[in-house]
Amino acid sequence: MTFLMLAVSLAIPLLGAMMLLESPIDPQSFSFKEPPFMFGVLQPNTKLRQAERLFENQLNGPESIVNIGDVLFTGTADGRVVKLENGEIETIARFGSGPCKTRDDEPTCGRPLGIRVGPNGTLFVVDAYKGLFEVNPQKRSVKLLLSSETPIEGKKMSFVNDLTITRDGRKIYFTDSSSKWQRRDYLLLVMEGTDDGRLLEYDTVTKEVKVLLDQLQFPNGVQLSPEEDFVLVAETAMARIRRVYVSGLMKGGADMFVENMPGFPDNIRPSSSGGYWVAAATIRANPGFSMLDFLSDKPFIKRMIFKLFSQETVMKFVPRYSLVLEVSDSGAFRRSLHDPDGQVVTYVSEAHEHDGYLYLGSFRSPFICRLSLQSI
């Protein structure tokens, strides 16, 4: 009894202190459907472990990857856009300045995320903090197309994330994941369930910006269809991909392309089979346990977690399960590539197909992975 009384006497003031602490998030309650069973084309495997790591410990957070010929380009966590050729890394652009060592440096340093090749061999890049840029890789010149400081329909852009561009280079479709949360607080955005993300359209000729879809929960990767009639948008926090029609008879409409995915989707890129590659750094295991699914309708617990623990601490409890899905042009799962405990591929953010290989980006790993499609 004495021990019990002591425990209670300690617990009551501790709980009181916890209640007085402010939580950085005001989580909303929502619920997921039961995740799809991981069998058939979703059956867990170790195919991603056949990948090889490139530039290990020479690149930090190569989120998105493009190629011009056999030359690769990516953006890194220290604010650079780099060229990768013949085993060498060369910086071709920076959008920020100053030290780039901690999360507090990110807004000043800049953080290049989505990257695409335009029709004239220039690179179009979004920086999470700075906006939309065009980079000439030969001249090393940088042109600001749209600043994050520019309000769009009265709302600022706090987390510019990914982009996709028409073949003629006129229209750029891009995501702003939140007007409240910045990239460095992406876990708070996911846990809060903030629905202030948007899909936007930028016209490179008129400089006009339009909001195509709003009230999205962490809109992330985007991909224009081969016919350029719709744009796919990964709504990460809801484990789904939306389809927004941008031309043709359906223009202005939107529907669901893939619902109730087995992972939380990041970037979307075309596959040579006419479908799409979708990367997911966190899965919704079934059978198994998904922390995000469990917490989705428990805002009180989420609030308490972030009263007590930092984002980095919480990330340590997220399984390092990398998943790459290939989906058809109608949204059906074609195949899945797994690294169940992140032995080789970790924190995967994108699968970029080129010349028989998948080049796998990551939002926090210090390398790129390359996987031969013939080997799987």
Curated annotation (Swiss-Prot):
GO molecular-function terms, A-Z: arylesterase activity
Q: What family classification does the UniProt entry report for this protein? A: Belongs to the strictosidine synthase family.
Disulfide-bond pairs as recorded: none
Keywords of this protein's UniProt record, alphabetized? Answer: Glycoprotein, Membrane, Transmembrane, Transmembrane helix
Q: Does the keyword Cell cycle apply?
A: no
Instruction: Please name the source species.
Output: Rattus norvegicus
Coarsely, its chief localization is membrane
Question: Glycosylation positions?
Answer: N120
Extract the Gene3D superfamilies matched here.
TolB, C-terminal domain (2.120.10.30)
- What role does this protein play? Exhibits strong arylesterase activity with beta-naphthyl acetate and phenyl acetate. May play a role in adipocyte differentiation.
**Segments crossing the lipid bilayer:** 1-17
Q: Which GO terms describe its cellular component?
A: cell surface; membrane
Keyword Magnesium on this protein?
no
Q: Where does the record place it?
A: Membrane
Which InterPro entries does the record associate with it? 6-blade_b-propeller_TolB-like, Strictosidine_synth_cons-reg
Question: Its topology with respect to the membrane?
Answer: Single-pass membrane protein
Could you tell me which Pfam families the record lists for this protein? SSL_N (PF20067), Str_synth (PF03088)
Q: Which domain of life is it from?
A: Eukaryota
User: What is the designated name of this protein?
Assistant: Adipocyte plasma membrane-associated protein
